[in-house]
């Protein structure tokens, strides 16, 4: 039996309800750092020009034409990790990506950390006014940057424009607590998800077998409510979620979905069926389970799950309790 988690519940329980009834250094490194940045830009520009067959000097300013700099990564022979390391943020150790801003002494810090700082973390000098480092931006456009989750096993290196989007969906990023509506802020590896659920969310029931009945009690509770249950079969764990939301005043909808405690690739090996039965009526939904990396919110937003309103729920409910037949199968 799955009891509801309503607003104001404890965070350690069955997915607490949604709030409101809804569900270093001193100044000595200044010159050296600025010189290193300038040297890196000059070296990359020279290498790019050589690879493109540009010869001779440019009259006037002594700069290399832009077309000679904006080359693909393969056009930079002898590229080394030392060059990429020049873009390392001294605060978070991720990479400083365009638009690249520097302090008055030439030190770099990523835009995310910059918003939290009042002075340069390297020289303690002012970060304002903002100074754009166009040379380093051109160098960055020629380099592949490792995914921020490379230490966790991701082997991809990407152009800076592709890096943020990849990291949003990277399979190696930390997993968050999959309990919907809970205020739990836990993060960890995939192997740690089930131990976390068993320790911090002990009220969640786990049923064994590929065919079970998910019984949601007290579906007439007001406001946004979540019901959660675990199902274990085929050597994997699945999370069953029934969520009630008030889409607009006076109109409530139920959303039911199955998540795999696993990766997206693992989820593709399974299919699930949700079925409401009663009074010679039947409502069925079949789909591939989502990975807990994807979560419930996106599926609900796109209605990519079993969706029904309160009038439908009452057709299948018995004394305010709703039973959903859940079947997991391997593809």
UniProtKB/Swiss-Prot annotation:
In embryos it is expressed in all blastomeres starting at the mid-blastulla. After 20 somite stage, it is expressed mainly in the posterior part. Expressed in brain, including the eye, the cranial cavity, otic vesicle, optic chiasm and in the gut. Residues 1-26 are annotated as: Disordered. Keywords: Biological rhythms, Cell cycle, Metal-binding, Transferase, Ubl conjugation pathway, Zinc, Zinc-finger. SUPFAM superfamilies: RING/U-box (SSF57850), TRAF domain-like (SSF49599). Residues 9-26 have a biased composition (Gly residues). It catalyses: S-ubiquitinyl-[E2 ubiquitin-conjugating enzyme]-L-cysteine + [acceptor protein]-L-lysine = [E2 ubiquitin-conjugating enzyme]-L-cysteine + N(6)-ubiquitinyl-[acceptor protein]-L-lysine. Belongs to the SINA (Seven in absentia) family. Zn(2+) 2 binds at residues 177, 184, 196, 201. The keyword Cell cycle applies. This is E3 ubiquitin-protein ligase Siah2. It is an enzyme of class 2 (transferase). E3 ubiquitin-protein ligase that mediates ubiquitination and subsequent proteasomal degradation of target proteins. E3 ubiquitin ligases accept ubiquitin from an E2 ubiquitin-conjugating enzyme in the form of a thioester and then directly transfers the ubiquitin to targeted substrates. It probably triggers the ubiquitin-mediated degradation of different substrates. Induces cellular growth arrest by inhibiting the G2/M transition. May play a role in the regulation of the cellular clock function. Residues 139-331 are annotated as: SBD. A zinc finger (RING-type) spans 89-124. Its EC number is 2.3.2.27. The RING-type zinc finger domain is essential for ubiquitin ligase activity. A zinc finger (SIAH-type) spans 142-202. GO terms for biological process: proteasome-mediated ubiquitin-dependent protein catabolic process; protein ubiquitination; regulation of circadian rhythm; rhythmic process; ubiquitin-dependent protein catabolic process. Zn(2+) 1 binds at residues 147, 154, 166, 170.
